[in-house]
Design a protein with these regions (language model features):
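Acidic, glycine-enriched loop/beta-strand segments at the rims
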Residues: 24-30, 43-55, 67-68, 362-370, ...
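Active-site core of metal-dependent hydrolases
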Residues: 53, 149, 230-321, 336, ...
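Bacterial N-terminal signal peptides
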Residues: 8-17
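N-terminal metal-binding scaffold of metallo-dependent hydrolase/deaminase domains
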Residues: 2-5, 20-72, 84
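His/Asp/Glu-enriched, well-ordered alpha-helical/loop segment
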Residues: 40, 102-103, 109-115, 119-121, ...
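Polyanionic/metal-chelating signatures
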Residues: 134, 141-280
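Divalent metal-coordination and catalytic microenvironments
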Residues: 41, 56, 61, 83, ...
């Protein structure tokens, strides 16, 4: 019997050892050493400008020079980009990346949502898991930064921007507490399509959904009224973390991200911003094309949840989600493109931009919608979003057009000047099973 258990133990350890070998061993890169120079590159700056046969110098994680007449210092590490396309690192504008791993009911891998209507004091950054297998997959497709946000019923909590090459959440932190997320209740009597967006609202079959929605809207307003009064007081008998969380909103240091797809939801968001003096960002924007002029007049940016989607309403054109980015661009709305179907599917962010470029945007406008526009909305455009001197060296090099599935073949990526691995779990499995079946 003893020998039987010993044999079983050995077999078990062998299985674990084999599985361990199958796991990726992708480590965060060390700091940049010396000066690096990308030469003979076609540089897509991110602001609409294209430079041909250009050179990019970066040192200590910062871009020091970009142009066609740049002198390369002696001893610099040269990266020949002849025939290649160079872009700013892509930015995922709203995601549960690192908070949610396996969506199909594996609770231990998910930490993106708290119970209750008011979780204003929640900070998503502390739950960010740098060991997520999804991070490397997104990074291999050019996404170098992500805006990580919580989810919830109503007042969801605070978001942060992370860079996708780190050992822990402290290292990953790019900009902490960028804003607060709320989910605007739906004012549709019946749900339908993406326009019936109503995250987390559980209504009984016999209840009045509109009354329930207005009650929840009053809950949001009451919270901000109480938070404003709290923040105006200099001394408090007791600290209230939920009310304190809104202080930066009233001071204009953070933005209020409002999940809203319906026109009525967005109108309520605009009104909320005017009432309390908040900087509002619409997240979703399925029907934003219907009020594009109003959004532009009120300087309300939009994070479009998905381009590869069905229309929000049965009366919309079948290709309306493809056309919405161009319509917002024409109206003068600052917008960014997103992909929210699934964390691993977000690797297709650049292809959403490619579709938008087919339906009215220019290629460089589409690129801006996943780089510089996103950086502006998140308040990080002073350090990233474009390839310009003084900004972080967040750079991707591709064999071809990154907006096209056929051309998006990355050869190198840099995050704050560090040469970052392109390997990921999916690539390793691809190589593993090629080897098994003798495929070259």
């Amino acid at each position: 019997m003893k020998n039987k258990y010993s044999t079983l133990l050995i077999l078990t350890l062998a299985v674990f050892a084999n599985n361990a070998k199958a796991q990726e061993t992708v480590y965060p890169a060390g700091p940049q050493k010396g000066v690096s120079a990308i030469t003979h590159a076609t540089v897509h700056v991110g602001n609409g400008t294209i430079l041909t046969d250009a050179t990019i110098l970066f040192e200590k994680g910062k871009i020091t020079a970009v142009g066609t007449g740049v002198s390369i210092p002696k001893g610099a590490t040269e990266i020949d980009a002849t025939g290649k396309q160079v872009y700013p690192g892509l930015i995922l504008p709203s995601s549960s990346l690192g908070l949610r791993e396996i969506s199909s009911g594996v609770r231990g891998s998910n930490d993106y949502q708290e119970i209750g209507e008011n979780n204003a004091d929640i900070r998503s950054i502390v739950s960010y898991n740098t060991d997520s297998k999804i991070i490397n997959v997104l990074r291999s497709n050019g996404i170098l930064l992500a805006h990580v946000s919580p989810s919830g019923e109503l007042i969801e909590g605070r978001s942060s921007v992370v860079q996708l090459d780190a050992w822990n959440y402290e290292d990953a932190e790019y900009k902490a507490n960028t804003g607060m997320y709320i989910s605007m209740p739906s004012l549709m009597a019946r749900r339908g399509g993406r326009g019936g967006f109503m995250r987390g609202m559980m209504m009984g079959g016999g209840g009045d959904p509109l009354k329930a929605a207005f009650d929840k809207i009053e809950t949001i307003k009451t919270y901000f009224i109480e938070a404003k009064a709290y923040c105006q007081e200099k001394v408090h008998a007791n600290n209230n973390l939920k009310l304190e969380a809104a202080r930066a909103l009233f001071e204009g240091k953070q933005k209020l991200y409002v999940r809203a797809n319906e026109v009525k939801q967005m109108l309520l968001a605009i009104d909320l911003g005017k009432t309390f003096g908040f900087n509002i960002v619409i997240v979703g924007g399925g029907e934003s094309f219907q009020i594009a002029g109003l959004l532009a007049d009120n300087k309300i940016p939009v994070i479009l949840d998905e381009t590869h989607a069905l229309p929000a309403s049965e009366d919309d054109d079948v290709d309306q989600p493809y056309k919405t980015p161009a319509q917002l661009q024409k109206a003068g709305v600052l917008f960014a493109l997103n992909d929210v179907s699934d964390n691993s599917k977000q690797r297709n962010l650049s292809f959403n931009a490619g579709t938008a470029a087919t339906y009215g945007l220019t290629k460089e406008e589409a690129l801006s919608s996943i780089t510089l526009n996103t950086a502006k909305i998140l308040g990080i455009d002073n350090v990233t979003g474009s390839i310009e001197a003084g900004k972080d060296a967040n750079i991707i090099i591709s064999m071809g057009d990154i907006l096209d599935m056929r051309g998006n073949q990355l050869t190198q990526i840099f995050i704050q000047g560090r040469t970052v691995s392109l390997d990921n779990k999916q690539l390793q499995l691809y190589e593993r099973y090629k080897h098994k079946y003798g495929i070259k």
